[in-house]
Amino acid sequence: MTSIAVCPGSFDPVTLGHLDIIQRGANVFDEVIVAVLHNRNKVPLFSVEERLELLKKATEHIPNVTIDSFNGLLIDYVKQKQAKAIIRGLRAVSDFEYEMQAASINKKLGPDVETFFMMTSNQYSYLSSSIVKEVAKYEADVSDIVPPVVAEALKAKFSSSPRNK
């Protein structure tokens, strides 16, 4: 039986920390579906379509990873994909409280689905998409914290709009 896991997130934009979790998940599961959330509560820098394309390019070297997007409850999406696992990265203890609540409700709504927490590698423990956007907004070099395709996209995004200094 094929083990399928879903790795959900906003990925606005995808960082090397995200890729670290995705790669490590792909080492454990037969198939990892990286699922971009349509989050109406956030105003994204990149559209869902742009994030899907950036993720496809950033993960093309990982054969057992597919990229998709979803609306609604994560657990419904996971069941639809016949996955048995959710992969979540944890940077710090501060992430754990929210992730534990989410895992608990997902377990209640989908008793057959397990949530796997992966600690972010130390070199990425400070990294978030929000920090990346803040640094990139001021046209600082982000090439050591995001995949090259994302660094190019950020540069294009911020050079085409007024700088907020």
UniProtKB/Swiss-Prot annotation:
<keyword id="KW-0460">Magnesium</keyword>
<feature type="binding site">
    <location>
        <position position="99"/>
    </location>
    <ligand>
        <name>ATP</name>
    </ligand>
</feature>
<feature type="binding site">
    <location>
        <position position="74"/>
    </location>
    <ligand>
        <name>substrate</name>
    </ligand>
</feature>
<comment type="similarity">
    <text>Belongs to the bacterial CoaD family.</text>
</comment>
<dbReference type="GO" id="GO:0005737">
    <property type="term" value="C:cytoplasm"/>
</dbReference>
<dbReference type="InterPro" id="IPR014729">
    <property type="entry name" value="Rossmann-like_a/b/a_fold"/>
</dbReference>
<feature type="binding site">
    <location>
        <position position="88"/>
    </location>
    <ligand>
        <name>substrate</name>
    </ligand>
</feature>
<dbReference type="GO" id="GO:0005524">
    <property type="term" value="F:ATP binding"/>
</dbReference>
<dbReference type="InterPro" id="IPR004821">
    <property type="entry name" value="Cyt_trans-like"/>
</dbReference>
<feature type="site" description="Transition state stabilizer">
    <location>
        <position position="18"/>
    </location>
</feature>
<comment type="pathway">
    <text>Cofactor biosynthesis; coenzyme A biosynthesis; CoA from (R)-pantothenate: step 4/5.</text>
</comment>
<feature type="binding site">
    <location>
        <begin position="89"/>
        <end position="91"/>
    </location>
    <ligand>
        <name>ATP</name>
    </ligand>
</feature>
<keyword id="KW-0963">Cytoplasm</keyword>
<feature type="binding site">
    <location>
        <position position="42"/>
    </location>
    <ligand>
        <name>substrate</name>
    </ligand>
</feature>
<keyword id="KW-0067">ATP-binding</keyword>
<comment type="subunit">
    <text>Homohexamer.</text>
</comment>
<keyword id="KW-0808">Transferase</keyword>
<feature type="binding site">
    <location>
        <position position="10"/>
    </location>
    <ligand>
        <name>substrate</name>
    </ligand>
</feature>
<dbReference type="InterPro" id="IPR001980">
    <property type="entry name" value="PPAT"/>
</dbReference>
<feature type="binding site">
    <location>
        <begin position="124"/>
        <end position="130"/>
    </location>
    <ligand>
        <name>ATP</name>
    </ligand>
</feature>
<keyword id="KW-0547">Nucleotide-binding</keyword>
<feature type="binding site">
    <location>
        <position position="18"/>
    </location>
    <ligand>
        <name>ATP</name>
    </ligand>
</feature>
<dbReference type="GO" id="GO:0015937">
    <property type="term" value="P:coenzyme A biosynthetic process"/>
</dbReference>
<dbReference type="GO" id="GO:0004595">
    <property type="term" value="F:pantetheine-phosphate adenylyltransferase activity"/>
</dbReference>
<dbReference type="Pfam" id="PF01467">
    <property type="entry name" value="CTP_transf_like"/>
</dbReference>
<feature type="binding site">
    <location>
        <begin position="10"/>
        <end position="11"/>
    </location>
    <ligand>
        <name>ATP</name>
    </ligand>
</feature>
<protein>
    <recommendedName>
        <fullName>Phosphopantetheine adenylyltransferase</fullName>
        <ecNumber>2.7.7.3</ecNumber>
    </recommendedName>
</protein>
<keyword id="KW-0173">Coenzyme A biosynthesis</keyword>
<comment type="function">
    <text>Reversibly transfers an adenylyl group from ATP to 4'-phosphopantetheine, yielding dephospho-CoA (dPCoA) and pyrophosphate.</text>
</comment>
<keyword id="KW-0548">Nucleotidyltransferase</keyword>
